[in-house]
Every structure is written in structure tokens, then in C-alpha cells.
Design a protein with these regions (language model features):
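A conserved regulatory-domain signal marking ACT and ACT-like small-molecule sensing domains
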Residues: 1-117
Length: 117
């Protein structure tokens, strides 16, 4: 069964997510804002919307490493070179409070969504 969800943050930015039910309460996300992605939502996750530029992924991993977050899975998807990209980071442990604010200090990061289990 397919589903679609529209989310809006406090700043009014909208993210549309499309996924499918795998049964037993499990889902797989297959699109974010029309871009093909693939993650299950079985872990705590960060969804980072960013400009496709060098150094952004390094910023993300440094922030997480400095806070002792172990990355279980990490995937990068982009619309096209140099345009909007999406980094999905999944972790076994809960993500630290305020990690979204720290990530947004990078001017190439547009939005961060934290999904806790």
C-alpha cells in the first residue's frame, strides 16, 4: 500500500514524502520532494536537505561524530549535480537534542528533519 505525507516545519518549508507499507508496521520511504530515495525508517534518522556542494557531508558527519553518534547507514541522493541533494543518516541510538540546529549552521543546508524511534 502506497502513502503520501506532506510535512511543514515552523519556517513554512514543505517536504512531501512518499512511501509504501511493508506490513507489520514497517514502511519504506521511496521519494522525498519527488526525488527517489530508499530508507526503511527502522532506525533513528536525519533527513538533510542541502545544496549539492563539497564539504556538506563532512559537516554532517563531524557534527554527529563530535556527539558520539554511530552511523548505521548513510545515503546521499540528488536531483542533479550542483542542485538539491538529500542525505539520510540512520543511527541505532537516539539523535542528540539540538543536532538539527547545529547542522543548519552550514549555509548549504536548507532543512533538517529528525525522526526518532
Amino acid at each position: 500500500m502506497l502513502f503520501r505525507s506532506r510535512m511543514e516545519n515552523a519556517a513554512g518549508q514543505v517536504m512531501t514524502v512518499r512511501g509504501e507499507s511493508l506490513g507489520g508496521g514497517k514502511v519504506r520511504i521511496v521519494r522525498i520532494n519527488g526525488v527517489e530515495v530508499d530508507f526503511t525508517g527502522e532506525y533513528n534518522a536525519l533527513i538533510v536537505v542541502q545544496q549539492d556542494k563539497p564539504g556538506v557531508v563532512a559537516h554532517i558527519t563531524k557534527i554527529l561524530s563530535d556527539r558520539g553518534v554511530n552511523i548505521a547507514f548513510m545515503r546521499l541522493f540528488r536531483e542533479e549535480k550542483g542542485h538539491t541533494a538529500y542525505t539520510i543518516v540512520e543511527s541505532d541510538e537516539r539523535l542528540p537534542e539540538g543536532v538539527d540546529r547545529l547542522l543548519l549552521e552550514n549555509p548549504n543546508i536548507r532543512d533538517v528533519m529528525v525522526v526518532q524511534q
